[in-house]
């Protein structure tokens, strides 16, 4: 068995222990970042006088050959390859010779090497996730614009509450996703720092220029403390927290649409492309994609919880427990890379049913408007709330809708009711009264959409 550390040991590793500790099965996906970091390191130690220019160039040439094998799918992982670092260095030695390949790791530890790989990988995947999130926001804007004229019940406690435009509901998710995007940008300011050169825990003894390394790797700055650099994974925890919050937002969207797909609601119909059938019941059209979007939130929360539990009691500095960070990170990123484009496709291709939404509107949704009517007549709101409660009870006693309650009945409860009360019973007027910023009036939503378009086009 070939390892990077075997000199002081008199016994070979137990095969059971080797299988248990090897991480090549999952960290191999860091191959490109690992090679990129190693090329930058070769340049850095050449600048520090530890390599000749010819040695540097030969190392870089060999590393690019290893990269080409990974890219073409021809790289062969050996049973002795402990992790991606071991695998790449082993293959590099086979290509350019072990003596020269052995110089590459001068002054470098796998502790700063792996965290460099992860930060490089995370930077790339975060950019792709950001693009996918923006596309989902664009899908929300498209649906909001198309559904501007559609009125529907808004809900609290899953009970019909007030009439709103479908566009207001859709834009609610846009703004959740906008905050998700801002959180991603914010966390990446802290994640996008160069750790290379921190060594195992105490720094580098060869005067390697870490700022030049950072520039070479595209990092805006370096990490500031070697012990902190190699031992903490808070940047991954932030990413997993972000992923969990975004997952919850996707779950809430899925929960709404899953409910609305039922025959009892009938507000939307999913595309056949995003539905499945039953192995027993031929009539079924199941919203499996939505249900799994909802279920994946639990997975993302689990990824965060798992890593929090791993790091909570670790003494400084590096511990092999931190090997557990990558599977959680990869899982969260993979989950969202699948979920975000699917959610966008569901929104774009579902059919909404304005007639069913309109049919769900009933006079009781205008009870607040009736209370507001009395407020405009000079009654304090708390009193108007109580008065309208009595009106609702009287309509229920008579078994008629609120709008059909005779004026005489209304005036028996409050003399402030007059002929103009009939104007209350209009859903379009109701939504148009809510024209304050953020409200459901057309003009207010148009302002939101205009703001949203600027944000996705920045």
Residue ranges of predicted features:
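A helix-coil-helix interface module used to build multimeric assemblies
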Residues: 1-203, 208-215, 276-277, 292, ...
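Structural signal for hydrophobic packing residues in well-ordered secondary-structure cores
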Residues: 46, 63-74, 92, 96, ...
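A structural signal for small-residue-enriched, beta-sheet-centric alpha/beta enzyme cores
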Residues: 110, 223-227, 363
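Charged, flexible cofactor/metal-binding loops and thiol motifs
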Residues: 118-119, 123, 130, 145, ...
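Glycine-rich cofactor/substrate-binding loops
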Residues: 1-37, 281-458
């Amino acid at each position: 068995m070939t390892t990077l550390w075997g000199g002081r040991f008199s016994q070979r590793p137990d095969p059971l222990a080797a299988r248990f500790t090897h991480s090549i099965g999952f960290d191999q996906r860091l191959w490109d970042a690992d090679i990129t970091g190693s090329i930058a390191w070769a340049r850095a130690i050449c600048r520090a006088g530890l390599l000749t220019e010819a040695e540097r160039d030969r190392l870089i040439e060999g590393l690019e050959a290893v990269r080409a094998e990974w890219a073409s799918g021809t790289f062969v992982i050996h049973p002795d390859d402990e992790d991606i670092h071991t695998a790449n260095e082993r293959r590099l030695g086979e290509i350019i010779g072990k003596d020269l390949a052995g110089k590459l790791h001068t002054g470098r530890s796998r502790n700063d090497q792996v965290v460099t790989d992860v930060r490089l990988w995370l930077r790339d995947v975060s950019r792709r996730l950001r693009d996918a999130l923006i596309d989902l926001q664009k899908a929300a804007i498209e649906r909001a614009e198309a559904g501007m004229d559609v009125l529907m019940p808004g809900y609290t406690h899953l009970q019909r509450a007030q009439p709103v435009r479908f566009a207001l509901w859709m834009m609610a998710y846009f703004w959740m996703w906008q905050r998700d995007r801002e959180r991603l940008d914010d966390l990446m300011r802290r994640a996008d720092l160069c750790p290379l050169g921190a060594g195992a825990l105490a720094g580098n003894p060869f005067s390697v220029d870490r700022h030049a390394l950072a520039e070479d790797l595209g990092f805006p700055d370096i990490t500031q403390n070697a012990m902190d650099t190699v031992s903490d994974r808070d940047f991954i925890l932030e990413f997993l927290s972000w992923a969990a919050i975004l997952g919850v937002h996707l779950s809430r969207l899925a929960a709404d649409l899953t409910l609305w797909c039922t025959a009892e609601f009938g507000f939307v119909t999913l595309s056949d492309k995003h539905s499945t059938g039953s192995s027993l019941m031929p009539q079924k059209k199941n919203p499996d994609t939505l249900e799994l979007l909802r279920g994946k939130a639990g997975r993302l929360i689990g990824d965060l919880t798992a890593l929090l539990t791993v790091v909570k009691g670790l003494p400084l500095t590096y511990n092999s427990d931190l090997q557990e960070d990558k599977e959680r990170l990869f899982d969260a990123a993979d989950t969202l890379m699948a979920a975000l484009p699917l959610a966008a496709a569901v929104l774009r291709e579902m059919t909404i049913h304005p007639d069913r939404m309109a049919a769900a509107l009933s006079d009781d949704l205008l009870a607040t408007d009736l209370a507001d009517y009395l407020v405009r007549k000079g009654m304090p709101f708390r009193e108007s709330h109580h008065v309208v409660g009595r009106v609702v009870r009287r309509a229920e006693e008579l078994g008629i809708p609120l709008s059909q309650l005779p004026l005489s009945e209304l005036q028996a409860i409050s003399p402030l009711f007059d002929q103009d009360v009939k104007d209350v019973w209009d859903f379009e007027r109701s939504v148009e009264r809510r024209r304050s910023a953020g409200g459901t009036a057309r003009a207010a939503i148009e302002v939101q959409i205009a703001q949203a378009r600027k944000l996705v086009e920045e």
